[in-house]
């Protein structure tokens, strides 16, 4: 599995204090532009690669996505995402994006930022 700095406790503590970690998508400077490029998510199956704290998965469900799956290599990120998500239509799993094999047409939208 790819090594990641997010499972280093000191780094993760610092990352957790960044605006994007505290304020979610609204704290990410790229979000206003990215949001305008996204299609209508109602009824769609959405995959978030490198889901971090799960902000996009939760937002996708708020927009009507049928399913949101978040994948991350970091156990720390996944633990935070799971702790702040109660929606059964959101699933988080640990995977290495460099080795990820998905079935054809498994998702309607794949997102990563």
Give the residues covered by each predicted segment.
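Intrinsic disorder/low-structure terminal segments
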Residues: 10-14, 52, 91, 106
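Class I SAM-dependent methyltransferase SAM/SAH-binding core
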Residues: 47, 53-99
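A short acidic, Gly/Pro-enriched loop at the edge of an enzyme's catalytic core
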Residues: 98-109
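A short beta-strand submotif of the Rossmann-like class I SAM-dependent methyltransferase core
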Residues: 112-113
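Nucleotide donor/acceptor-binding cores
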Residues: 43-45
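Conserved class I S-adenosyl-L-methionine
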Residues: 1-41, 55
